[in-house]
Amino acid sequence: MPIITLPDGSQRQFAHSVSVMDVAADIGPGLAKACIAGRVNGELVDACELIEADASLAIITAKDEEGLDILRHSCAHLLGHAIKQLWPQTKMAIGPVIDNGFYYDVDLDRTLTDDDLAALEERMLALAAKDYDVIKKKVSWQEARDVFEARGETYKVEILDQNIARDDQPGLYHHEEYVDMCRGPHVPNMRHCHHFKLQKMSGAYWRGDSNNKMLQRIYGTAWADKKQLKGYLQRLEEASKRDHRKIGKQLDLYHMQEEAPGMVFWHNDGWTIFRELETFIRGKLKEYDYQEVKGPFMMDRVLWERSGHWEKYAQAMFTTQSENREYAIKPMNCPGHVQIFNQGLKSYRDLPLRMAEFGSCHRNEPSGSLHGLMRVRGFTQDDAHIFCTEEQIMEEVSACIRMVYDVYGTFGFENIVVKLSTRPEQRIGSDEAWDRAEAALAEALVLNGLKYDLQPGEGAFYGPKIEFTLHDCLDRAWQCGTVQLDFALPGRLGATYVGEDNERHVPVMIHRAILGSLERFIGILTEEYAGLFPTWLAPTQAVVMNITDNQADYAVKVAKALNDAGLRAKADLRNEKIGFKIREHTLKRVPFMLVCGDKEVEAGKIAVRTRKGADLGTYPVEELVALLTQEVQTRGQKKVEE
């Protein structure tokens, strides 16, 4: 007679074992219809799972995050069902859930086309409309292998042989005649899987190994209802318009080419944005009392072995040889900063020591993962390393948090999700040290009035960390900032200081990044602003345009006055209609278009228009220079139109 305890504390008693779906039906028909799965004693299970003893139970529906993931996973199985009907010789590989959707890797003797994708989606819709039950069967390992061997599913057989223990009982999910294997859970009925869209195809090596066969990967998205699906597709359309790769080309910011994959060729206007970001962060470094240093581009393999990076990151490091020595081009700045710290005897009075660098780093990312500025091989980190005592951790972390929010606020990012990752099972250091470190991070977050999500066990083996994830105007998440404690690296590389007791101690190291990579952050900003960079970041801040040749000298004079004040201005003296000029510079996202005709010349003024089409009237040149300068210097806190 199991007693089921529900999330609100209420209890229901049953005379015999019951399934999750039985409990949902006992509560009400509406909940039974919405039930996708259950969480029994904290574990996600299928709706058909029997509960035979007292247990806590939460009914999972599509309104829950887990429910949406289950729905998407079942849509991957639906894709498998459809593709096997259309092309029966297809061999199915894996079909996991990803952010906002799912994919399935398939081995097919034809290259799928866009027309094939449309036909596949149509078949999926027809199958889902049948609202058939999904039947789960737990079978022995051998029975599962026999099923897939008989069906010619060589990839499923390989998964069983290499990844599933012989004494395990795999779950087989039956979609009418189609059978797939999964841990689950999955939806009990396909009525939950009506709102999806197949999106694109790509190539993917089996098990991510380039030595294996290239499979075809089919991507899709799935949502709980029509409104959610429509909203997501609209956001995707808007994201496509904001794609930094398109805008970067339109605005002539940068380019990339095959001869240097994952490396950025910055053009003048893109490099202007890059340098402005550097200048901004450099000012913050001074404000928060950091030293700025510069480490070498590459260092001997021996140093990377001592730091531990060679063991963990060797495959991602570019290397070269000279005079029988092997060097690694740095993938990160921290070992170099420890070398700088080690020069000269350090006392506790020297701590905290805050060391920052705009470090040029390189990582050998897989070519298939490269994506514009968002995923590159050569990048510039804005990270810093703080050497401090254990007692100084909380205060230093708190200052890092203030700096992070100070910087993000300047760019208009207000929706920031904070996560605190605590000790993993495999770690170095005593439990007492971890207790103090985790408490210090949590206290720093509370001190700054921040709510945070706890991620137990997700910290690095060498220390807990805080992650800052930005949500942009399309509600996409970008993990940029980190504050990571490190108990390991200073000791591995021989960093010490003399304490008040005249004994040598190993300092705690705090890794701190705000933008992460400048390249990636420029990509994020390009999409966030849709290329409409704030005036202080805009490559060209103002264009002065004459109406006829009579005002050419005056236009040059106004542009010179702006440039002499430290602004970035150009004069457009082309023999084109003023409307044509305005449109062209609007498309180039220039913040201010300054127009001069005979009246403006005579009055010593200039007519001001914005890239958004607002007519701000006429200003004396000196006044406009002062107002634009103020907007740039305050980074938009005081704007011309105000």
Swiss-Prot record:
In the UniProt record, does the keyword RNA-binding occur?
yes
- The protein's predominant localisation is cytoplasm
Q: Which InterPro entries match?
A: aa-tRNA-synt_IIb (IPR002314), aa-tRNA-synth_II (IPR006195), aa-tRNA-synth_II/BPL/LPL (IPR045864), Anticodon-bd (IPR004154), Anticodon-bd_dom_sf (IPR036621), Beta-grasp_dom_sf (IPR012675), TGS (IPR004095), TGS-like (IPR012676)
GO CC, one annotated term: cytosol
EC class (word): ligase
* BP-aspect Gene Ontology terms: threonyl-tRNA aminoacylation
What is the phylogenetic placement of the source species in the record?
A: Bacteria, Pseudomonadati, Pseudomonadota, Gammaproteobacteria, Aeromonadales
- What is the E.C. number? 6.1.1.3
Q: Which NCBIfam families match?
A: thrS
Obligatory cofactor(s): Zn(2+)
Q: Which Pfam families match?
A: HGTP_anticodon, TGS, tRNA-synt_2b, tRNA_SAD
**Residue ranges annotated for the TGS domain, each copy included:** 1-61
Q: Which domain of life is it from?
A: Bacteria
According to UniProt, the name of this protein is Threonine--tRNA ligase
Q: Where is this region: Catalytic?
A: 243-534
Q: How is the cofactor bound?
A: Binds 1 zinc ion per subunit.
Q: How does it assemble?
A: Homodimer.
Query: What species is this protein from?
Result: Aeromonas salmonicida (strain A449)
UniProt keyword ATP-binding present? yes
Q: Where in the cell is it found?
A: Cytoplasm
